[in-house]
Amino acid sequence: MSASIARATVRAVSRRKILSTRAALTLTPSAVNKVKQLLDNKPEYIGLKVGVRTRGCNGLTYTLDYTKNKEQSDEEVLQDGVRVFIEKKAQLTLLGTEMDFVETKLSSEFVFNNPNIKGTCGCGESFNI
C-alpha cells in the first residue's frame, strides 16, 4: 500500500546530458536530499514509487507515493542512499529523465525533466509522449 506525498510537474527538455548510468531515472542532489528528508521519520517505508496515470488535458501525469515494498515488476533506482521504485507502466515514459526538487517562494515540488515528452499542458502537470 502506498500513500501520496507530493505533486509533480513535468518539463520537456530538448537535450539531456549523457550520464554514465543505466538507470531510467536520475536524481539531482536537491531531489536526493528531499527524498531523504521525506523518509527520515517514516521507517515503515522503504522508498518512493513513481507511477503514471491517465489524467489531465494532455493525457498522462506522474504520481509520487511512499512505498512499503517493491513489486516484482518495479524497477529500482538506488542513488546516493535513496531508493526510488518505478512502476512498470511508467518505466518507458521515464527513460533518460532527471528528477529534481525545486523550491520557490510560491511552491515546492518535484520536477521531472523528461526528454521524451512531446507536449505538456499549460500548468505542466500532464504530458504526452
Curated annotation (Swiss-Prot):
Its main location: mitochondrion. InterPro entries: Fe-S_cluster_asmbl/transfer, FeS_biogenesis, FeS_cluster_insertion, FeS_cluster_insertion_CS, HesB-like_dom_sf. GO terms for molecular function: 2 iron, 2 sulfur cluster binding; metal ion binding. Keywords: Iron, Iron-sulfur, Metal-binding, Mitochondrion, Transit peptide. It holds the Pfam family Fe-S_biosyn. It is found in: Mitochondrion. GO terms for biological process: heme biosynthetic process; iron-sulfur cluster assembly. Belongs to the HesB/IscA family. This is Iron-sulfur cluster assembly 1 homolog, mitochondrial. The gene is isca1.
